[in-house]
């Protein structure tokens, strides 16, 4: 994994690296310490968590720096963006070689907006976030769904059907997303112990 992180950060010309210090069993801070010296183009690192590699700053410091950017500058930068400008590079898992970057432009946002309208997503919806956010499915159907509608996401570090359905009951989760294995686990564990759920929609990829 450290080799993949080293390659993708360097190959994408990343200048700002934002990461959790740890997520589930993965120690990202340790990875950065191991390979970070190989990133001459990285100008700043922002860490969510207490384990911060040398030269990095915390999330609150990063947000505070935004107060130095004027509304006029922000508006000018926003106006300069075209729909066909690159927005995100999502990398493959690199199962046969090094990860390959798939470039998506800003029209992705319009596509996601249209899906939220089709599904009737509102600010009152609550999503369960257990899909990897560096994959297209998790990024669009969970992260962007929430960002574009102002809803809420309950994040999980790993997939655990029992824990997710328990949280769905207590947090009022209305949306679940997943693959056939996710849904198979959900159906199995809920049949064994039914919950009072507020679910109204699920997506299957």
Predicted regions and their residues:
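Conserved S/T- and glycine-rich ATP-binding loop of Class I adenylate-forming
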Residues: 86, 92-95, 127, 133, ...
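Adenylate-forming
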Residues: 17-33, 157-160, 173-205
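Conserved pre-ATP/AMP-binding loop-to-beta segment of ANL
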Residues: 53, 57-60, 65-91, 98, ...
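Conserved AMP-binding/adenylation subdomain of ANL enzymes
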Residues: 110-126, 133-175, 181-191
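Structural core segment of the AMP-binding/adenylate-forming
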Residues: 1-64
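A short helix->loop->beta-strand "cap" motif at the edges of active sites that frequently abuts
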Residues: 39-43, 151, 197-200
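Short coil-to-helix segment of the ABC ATPase nucleotide-binding domain corresponding to the Q-loop/switch region
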Residues: 105-106
């Amino acid at each position: 994994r450290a080799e993949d992180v080293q390659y993708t950060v360097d190959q994408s010309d990343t200048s700002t690296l934002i990461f959790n210090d740890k997520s589930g069993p993965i120690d990202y801070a340790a990875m950065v310490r191991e390979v970070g010296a190989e990133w001459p183009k990285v100008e700043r690192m922002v860490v969510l968590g207490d384990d911060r590699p040398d030269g990095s700053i915390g999330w609150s410091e990063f947000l505070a720096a935004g107060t130095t950017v004027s509304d006029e500058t922000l508006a000018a930068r926003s106006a300069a963006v075209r729909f066909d400008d690159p927005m995100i590079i999502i990398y493959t898992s690199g199962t046969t070689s090094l990860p390959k970057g798939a470039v998506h432009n800003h029209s992705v946002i319009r596509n996601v907006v249209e899906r939220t309208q089709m599904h009737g997503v509102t600010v009152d919806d609550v999503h369960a976030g257990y899909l990897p956010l560096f994959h297209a499915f998790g990024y669009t159907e969970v992260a962007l769904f929430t960002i574009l509608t102002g809803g809420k996401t309950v994040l999980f570090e790993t997939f655990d059907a029992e824990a997710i359905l328990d949280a769905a009951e207590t947090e009022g989760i209305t949306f679940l997303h997943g693959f056939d294995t996710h849904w198979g686990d959900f159906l199995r564990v809920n049949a064994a112990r039914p919950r009072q759920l507020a679910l109204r929609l699920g997506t299957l990829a």
